[in-house]
Amino acid sequence: MEASAAEQPSSPPPPLGDHCIHDGDFVVLKREDVFKAVQVQRRKKVTFEKQWFYLDNAIGHSYGSAFDVSSGGSLQLRKKLEEPASETKEAGTDNRNIVDDGKSQKLTQDDIKALKDKGIKGEEIVQQLIENSTTFRDKTEFAQDKYIKKKKKKYEAIVTILKPSTRILSIMYYAREPGKINHMRYDTLAQMLTLGNIRAGNKMIVMETCSGLVLGAMMERMGGFGSIIQLYPGDGPVRAATACFGFPKSFLSGLYEFPLNKVNSLLNGTFSAEMLSSEPKDSTPVEESNGELEEKEIAEQADEDNIVDAAENNSGEQRPMEIVPGDPENKEPKEKRSKRDYIQEKQRRQEEQRKRHLEAAALLGERNADGLIVASRFHPTPLLLSLLDFVAPSRPFVVYCQYKEPLLECYTKLRERGGVINLRLSETWLRNYQVLPDRSHPKLLMSGGGGYLLSGFTVVSDSLRADPSLKSCTGALDPHKAEEPAAKKQKCMESAS
């Protein structure tokens, strides 16, 4: 019954286009102020806000469409209702005579459940609740609107499907799982992208432990042009939020990753390709194509386990009806062949990962990055002091931290080190407002803080100018530098004569 209900489309879908929902797309479900990122797959049950449904009927419709969830789990496109003409509502002057004794509603919970079982829509249930309320007409007009809004939120199951973006995903993570993004608020992320001058064609370095949200925001703004080098701790980068963006494969060609524990060897000039081969072979593979390789590896591992379990069960059970001559001989090569294919595929992925690491090392070795973004749970001072050497002069850098004290220490160390200007430690202040006729005011509940930012620009310090290995670089930055002292000296001699 559920399958038949989910397969019946509510209306013929429009022709597919760039702004339409396709099978396999990553989308964001929205209900009131709650968001959830999912992937559109046919006949896959999705649970959202204590309701389950299928996304089959959403395929082909445009992003931003609203759907009603029916009792069978199918989505029905919600048509735009014409707003009724303004009618004079019967309302009271105040609520002083209204007593909340729990007896004002004639409908019981059993009656409401019976209405739901009959398949009555939420709008009709809300209308019956209004008609059976003995105190609704005595409420003020504002109280009536508040009552209707509250009942609609409870009984109307309206789901809006949105296209993923930096703003939507940052709001979703900050509301649902702020710990996974280091409590970075969405306005703070916007400030980071602006202060870091993220744009197409840049060569950026990012070190983040925010589930890939900062990385995805940078990739979205760069639009697939330029290169991003992600430094990661541990076995591999975490890009759960990056996968929710649903970037095409062309965006991943300019994305590189490099282990954080090899940065010091790269700075000292002792880095070599053999150091990458000494890493553990069972490290987490690079998530290409939004995690398809990881899912493929898990599926292959599950198939291998099923084959092994089947072999053990067949050997342990004695069933004459199932014994076929030659089966054990044919099964053993099949097992070996599947294991061999799995090992070869794993080695191929490791070799590709090693090549990408070498390419990232070559890009970092040029030391001409256009910017640096740091947003991690680690102390920012050692990270920033090490990674600034890979950034070209006159380029911005931005460091995020949930707390102010680590950034103050980082600020002091940068002042002592030199090579930076325009240092600024800032905190953004955000406040939401309710904007309604005669009821506009700041909301009572607001965010206590969204983190702190330390930003600045790199310059060529005196120690770098004195370094003979960088004379050619500084000379290229200012070709007339060698002529200025001679001209000034000649001018002084003329004045003395």
From Swiss-Prot:
The modification Phosphothreonine is found at residue 108. Residues 81-103, 275-354, 474-497 are annotated as: Disordered. It is found in: Nucleus. One of its GO terms (biological process) is tRNA methylation. Substrate binds at residues 349, 377. Keywords: Nucleus, Phosphoprotein, tRNA processing. Residues 95-105, 146-155, 176-183, 415-423, 434-441 are annotated as: Substrate. Residues 328-354, 478-487 have a biased composition (Basic and acidic residues). Residues 289-307 have a biased composition (Acidic residues). One of its GO terms (cellular component) is nucleus. Substrate-binding subunit of tRNA (adenine-N(1)-)-methyltransferase, which catalyzes the formation of N(1)-methyladenine at position 58 (m1A58) in initiator methionyl-tRNA. Together with the TRMT61A catalytic subunit, part of a mRNA N(1)-methyltransferase complex that mediates methylation of adenosine residues at the N(1) position of a small subset of mRNAs: N(1) methylation takes place in tRNA T-loop-like structures of mRNAs and is only present at low stoichiometries. Heterotetramer; composed of two copies of TRMT6 and two copies of TRMT61A. Belongs to the TRM6/GCD10 family. This is tRNA (adenine(58)-N(1))-methyltransferase non-catalytic subunit TRM6.
